[in-house]
Amino acid sequence: MEIKDEETTAEVAMVVQSRFRRVCVFCGSSHGKKKIYQDAAIELGKELVARNIDLVYGGGSVGLMGLVSQAVHNGGRHVIGVIPKTLMPREISGETVGEVKAVSDMHQRKAEMARQSDAFIALPGGYGTLEELLEVIAWAQLGIHDKPVGLLNVDGYYNPLLSFIDKAVEEGFIRPSARHIIVLAPTPKELIEKLEEYSPQHEKVVSKMKWEMEQMSYPQNYDIPRPKEGKMIIEAQRGSRLWM
């Protein structure tokens, strides 16, 4: 009886408790030329499973997207794929895993992925991956969300991007504190450990609460009056836009 209790205790101890329920992974619809990229996608999926974290991703079954989603699904965790209807024939090959949410366009895809997730991780990818990554970084800087953003820098893949960001800081286009929005690591285990400990240190442009309040109060159709002649001024005290 004591041996059985010890085994049960050991099994419980192996379960890693995470602060995240779901993590969004951005990655390519291609495998890349190096096997190390594919290995990293599978390893990331297994690391999410080990921490009882569900996956939110771009919904494709090809490339790194297919590998990470299959690894999470095989491990028994829930998978949510968000994909525009137009991209389904291109990015879905064979059976999909988990739940697939079809949306109308790329804007809705990114918004839904962000809404469903507690953190973001970027694997190697192309233009689409970069766009998704940079948008959630920009949202963090603006104060729209306070979720961690992680960069899985497999084999130094993102070193040129990091050099560009450092150059932008040096030239005064990005605040030094905003450089730390990006959490960086070469392996999935190390990256998720860093994300678990992440706390925003950068100065936000606007508070998250302000964004949420504006979103709730903003009318669906808001027309700014535009007379034929005149110029717009901003009346700061009232927060209204006027033309004179």
UniProtKB/Swiss-Prot annotation:
Gene Ontology terms for molecular function: cytokinin riboside 5'-monophosphate phosphoribohydrolase activity
InterPro entries: LOG, LOG_fam
E.C. number(s) listed in UniProt: 3.2.2.n1
Disulfide bonds: none
GO-annotated cellular components: cytosol; nucleus
Binding site for substrate: E91, R109, K110, G126, Y127, G128, T129, L130, E131, E132
GO biological process: cytokinin biosynthetic process
UniProt KW keywords: Cytokinin biosynthesis, Hydrolase
Catalyzed chemical reaction(s): N(6)-(dimethylallyl)adenosine 5'-phosphate + H2O = N(6)-dimethylallyladenine + D-ribose 5-phosphate; 9-ribosyl-trans-zeatin 5'-phosphate + H2O = trans-zeatin + D-ribose 5-phosphate
Function: Cytokinin-activating enzyme working in the direct activation pathway. Phosphoribohydrolase that converts inactive cytokinin nucleotides to the biologically active free-base forms.
Family indicated by similarity: Belongs to the LOG family.
NCBIfam families according to UniProt: Rossman fold protein, TIGR00730 family
Name of protein: Probable cytokinin riboside 5'-monophosphate phosphoribohydrolase LOGL2
Upper classification of the organism: Eukaryota, Viridiplantae, Streptophyta, Embryophyta, Tracheophyta
This protein's encoding gene: LOGL2
